[in-house]
């Protein structure tokens, strides 16, 4: 009689994580998107028909269509409109509405979160969002305050919160104070702006550690500057992240010489999207930061050829709307940046390794 004796019987549980329906989150500095109407409460004279730029309806319409084209082409990358778009340098809600009323963007049915800020030039930051994906629960501005400069006024931080696929998200968009007066002399203002955003993010995570925080904007500092790496606390190495920490996927890109704006023949990366550790690693929930298909970095910069000067002194620079008061018909002096957020799902296979031998009795 033969018996089969099973030895070395074991099961291995294999877990595979893969991205589905990647969502895009975008930040884009619209570079002085003003309407043509004089507003006596702000300094917008140069962007009027009578001003030095002779800003009129044809130029404004060209600018609106240019911005619409860029956002549509970002959507076309994976045939899906971005879920959230943070923007800066917009004069008011009306100009935002004109952008999304264009035929290219109207199908996305975007909604707007905007607050007028105390900036002297009247430029604000704001959000577009897709209500079919991001379920808005609330929004609020956070004013810039600095004890040593009580009369200094700049853009508010605009925040909004809600859910994506049932998971809590908290978004912030900002345009930190400029380098007017020099990088070092003006650094305390940007460090204070970073402190304000970091405090808000930490407070949100203290209430609910599962909330996924996304901080974006034109920070007027490079991704490797103190305001971002130390004050905001954005880590460039995803493997070094600790719970409650923050990750900046654009640090590696800057170190590789890749930037979002050019100045004096050098690329800078002022446009950043910083995410909380739980979004970077997927330590809570199922949504996490993803690379683009075949992508090297977790951050992305949209670099379509038409966004660049093709000739002249500034060949290779972003094609802006004006150089001085000379209309160029371009897009922005900044390139748009974006990230992908994918859904990480688990699949399980049971692998049986069985060895057997025959035994005669």
Predicted regions and their residues:
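Second-shell loop/turn segments in exported
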Residues: 49-60, 81-87, 114-115, 146-148, ...
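Metal-dependent phosphoester-hydrolase catalytic domains
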Residues: 203-213, 221-353
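Structural recognition of the beta-strand scaffold that forms the well-ordered cores
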Residues: 24-27, 83-88, 111-114, 125-129, ...
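Bacterial Sec-dependent N-terminal signal peptides
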Residues: 1-22, 361
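N-terminal, active-site-proximal structural segment of metallo-dependent hydrolase catalytic domains
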Residues: 18-103, 113-125, 297-300, 310-315, ...
């Amino acid at each position: 009689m033969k018996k089969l004796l099973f030895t070395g019987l074991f099961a291995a549980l294999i877990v595979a994580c893969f991205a589905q329906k990647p969502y895009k989150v975008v930040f884009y500095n619209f570079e002085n998107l003003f309407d043509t109407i004089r507003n006596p409460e702000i300094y917008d004279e140069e962007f009027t028909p009578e001003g030095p730029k002779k800003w009129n309806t044809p130029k404004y319409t060209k600018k609106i269509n240019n911005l619409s084209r860029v956002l549509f082409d970002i959507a076309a990358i994976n045939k899906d409109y971005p879920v959230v778009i943070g923007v800066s340098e917009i004069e008011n809600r009306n100009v935002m509405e004109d952008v999304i009323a264009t035929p290219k963007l109207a199908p996305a049915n975007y909604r707007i979160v905007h607050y007028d800020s105390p900036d002297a030039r009247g430029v604000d930051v704001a959000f577009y969002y897709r209500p079919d994906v991001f379920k808005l629960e609330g929004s609020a501005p956070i004013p810039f305050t600095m004890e040593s400069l009580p009369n200094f006024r700049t853009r508010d931080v605009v925040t909004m919160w809600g859910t994506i696929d049932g998971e809590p998200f908290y978004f912030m968009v900002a345009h930190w104070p400029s380098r007017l007066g020099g990088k070092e002399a003006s650094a305390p203002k940007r460090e204070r702006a970073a402190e304000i955003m970091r405090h808000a993010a930490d407070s949100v995570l203290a209430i609910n550690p599962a909330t996924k925080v996304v901080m974006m904007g034109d920070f007027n500092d490079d991704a490797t500057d103190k305001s971002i790496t130390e004050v905001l606390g954005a880590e460039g190495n995803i493997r070094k992240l600790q719970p409650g920490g923050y990750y900046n996927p654009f640090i590696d890109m800057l170190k590789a010489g890749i930037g979002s704006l050019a100045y004096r023949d050098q690329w800078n990366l002022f446009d950043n999207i910083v995410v909380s550790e739980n979004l970077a690693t997927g330590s809570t929930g199922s949504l996490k930061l993803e690379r683009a298909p075949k992508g090297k970095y977790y951050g992305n910069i949209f670099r379509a050829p038409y966004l660049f000067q093709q000739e002249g002194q500034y060949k290779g620079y972003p094609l802006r709307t004006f150089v001085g008061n000379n209309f160029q018909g371009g897009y922005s002096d900044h390139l748009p940046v974006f990230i992908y957020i994918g859904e990480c799902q688990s699949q399980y296979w049971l692998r049986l390794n069985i060895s057997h031998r025959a035994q005669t009795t």
